[in-house]
Swiss-Prot record:
Tree of life domain: Bacteria
Family (UniProt): Belongs to the LptD family.
GO biological process: Gram-negative-bacterium-type cell outer membrane assembly; lipopolysaccharide transport
Name of the protein this chain belongs to: LPS-assembly protein LptD
Species of the source: Xanthomonas euvesicatoria pv. vesicatoria (strain 85-10)
Signal peptide per UniProt: 1-22
Complex formation: Component of the lipopolysaccharide transport and assembly complex. Interacts with LptE and LptA.
Location (main, coarse): membrane
Location(s), subcellular: Cell outer membrane
Annotated keywords: Cell outer membrane, Membrane, Signal
Cellular component terms (Gene Ontology): cell outer membrane; transporter complex
Reported function: Together with LptE, is involved in the assembly of lipopolysaccharide (LPS) at the surface of the outer membrane.
Gene3D superfamilies membership: Lipopolysaccharide (LPS) transport protein A like domain (2.60.450.10)
Amino acid sequence: MRRALRLLPLPLSIAICLPAMAADKPLNWGLCPAVDPLPGFDGAPAADPKAAEMRQQLPTDIEGDQLSGTSTTPQYQGNVALKRGDQFLGADNLRMDTETGNYIAEGNVRYQDTSFRMVADRAEGNQDTDTHKVTNIQYQLVERRGNGDAESVDLQGQVGQMHRSTYTTCDPSQPIWRVRAPEIDVDNEEGFGTARNAVLQIGKVPVLYFPWFKFPIDDRRQTGLLFPQFGLSGRNGFDYLQPIYLNLAPNYDATLLPRYMSKRGFMFGTEFRYLYEGGRGEVTGNYLPNDKLRDKDRGSVFYSGYHNVNSNWQARSSISWVSDTRYVEDFTSRINGMGSASSLQSTVGIYGTGETWTAGLMADRWQLTDYTLDEQALPYNRQPRAYFTWEKPLGIFEAGIYAEAVRFTHDDSYFVRPPISGSSRDDNEDEYVRTNIRNKQYGSGARLDVKPYISMPLSGAAWFLTPTVAWRYTAYQLDSTLADTAPLTGNRTPTRSLPIASLDAGLYFDRETSLFGTNYLNTLEPRMYYLYVPYRDQDDLPVFDTRPFTFSYGQLFRDTRYTGADRQNDANQLTLAVTSRWLRQDDGREKLSLSAGQILYFSDSLVTINNSNNSAAGSEQTVEQGKSAWVADANYMINDRWSMGATYQWNPNSRKEDLASLRTRYLLNNDGIINLAYRYRRNLTDNSDQLKQADFSFLYPINPSWSAVGRYYYSLLDRKPLEIIGGVQWDSCCLAVRGLVRRFVRNRDGEMDNSIQIEFVLKGLSSFGQNTDRTLRRAILGYYRDDLYLVPPSNTTTNPDDYDPNLIP
């Protein structure tokens, strides 16, 4: 009797065909009716994934109101039900012939399992020849909300054919979109289907026609077309990308990425991915022959991958290359991270980690991607870099060491020829390209930096005390070109060694209190940090990768004010800071936190990076005896929806603020949000205003279906916007449409660009158009509500392979 259930998987062919192209990101089904298109059937087993996995080993039970016929031709009548595990098949009548293998089920034929439901008028076939036919079908995917119908389904073994079938995720009474196909061939053994003359309808209007296409019906990948992406911008014109997926092997595949830009021409791209037991990788390449705007060939190559050597060691690489310094500007449209977009980093290395140690051997190289700069702005290449760290408790002590050896090289910088008189850079870009006439040679050198330390962390219920003593030794081996560069003294093997001593101590007080009828736990957390580092003259040391840290609250508790090992500031200073928090006792949420601190300098700090060999290192003010700027941070949760935050630095020497930022956020219903921020920074070198910006962004739900989105990012210094976004979103049970208009600064010269982005999301099927989610998630903090509580990887700029003890407070 178990073979009688052979017909049960047939409707799954319909169920899996079209939704196999569904989007990976979570979908919002909140606007869908609570009632399923096909409610669960009476008498059907409850959904049970475990039973679904075991169904082939379970027996089949059959029941009905009446049983007639003979032992070879039984007939079941009235409420016929077949059950096996999570499967249920019901019908009004079931006739069988055990000698010929024929069967007929008719009258209210219905089927249900954990993921699928179906009703049909009639099902008939032959178990021996494994041929089946089901007529007048309606079905529903329980988890995906997909539903539709088919006039009939024919099955011969593992090959089936559906006639006049449809698919949608909409309410059947109001199908905003649906896919119709007069004929779909399904091969369950090979795992693919072939649709002919399929049409995507929005309402009753056909919008896409597919004369023939193949698609997967299970998790096995299949070669075929992916949904296109298109957009419109002032730089590229009409932009159309048609991905073509190639399933080359179970462990590697490729995607062809032909792209047409009306103002530039055809770009040919490809993406290749591979996967094996010990690692994976991905390489992407693009080539644009004879760009119509630039009159030259353009291209790029990107690779990333890793290989697990063993449980402790992993090899990783990330390679980036572009054909010219305008490539990033012309083919990307990000406004955030413009500084990082001025260069591309390529790295390759092997990295290890253990219970008490980390180590690595790597090399990197930088490429300039901003035509407004020259190679002097590039960081030094590290070719190679080796590092080792070790840290372990030893009784009441904790000992550790950080060691690094690096060979630094730099691409020679070239001068830029002046423009032709009366012309612009865009008109004569060739006159601006870098030539082979060298203006300056940076030279190269090697550096060894070793920093052993020992500390004694002591703590109690309301206090902690951690004295630490370290010794830092740094040695260089410079080539003559670099050693003879001013202001270096010609010494090719300079060294520096010095002790570092610190004492970190703090107290913790708390009390129970109430405010406006709410009970709180109020804390007071004073902290003291003393640092002593003797002065060493470091003017003969080059500057390779060292910059001053941006002064912040965390900087109050570090033993150096530099990132990198080329400078170690002298210090005789004491940090005094305090933090106070108000924590709600009923749920532990922080209502208010206030932090403030200041460094007291008992003597001048004479070490600076001024007058170094590296012009890109910038300059800094000498730290004089006295007091640092006051640093204050505050966060206030007005209620569960409204929060405010502020950071403020006030300099008692200049009696001016060095930095100020204010931000507020209001959470609306239906995942709406409003953000408002102000940022100010003063240039400490010449006391001029360095940055003054206002930023307003929102996702405002007008009603459950409509919402407005926007951003206005404005520079008060330049008196011009940096980015303007305006758009609307329409959402329904099964369809979402987003339209954006965007104006943004596209380069350091302040030139503006415009773009229009439109995206259609057919829920449970796919999306086409430009990826507006990426733009809105970057521009509107909280567009994805989870981003308020998690740090998105795209927003972190620290390279995990660049361990630096100076970054650890």
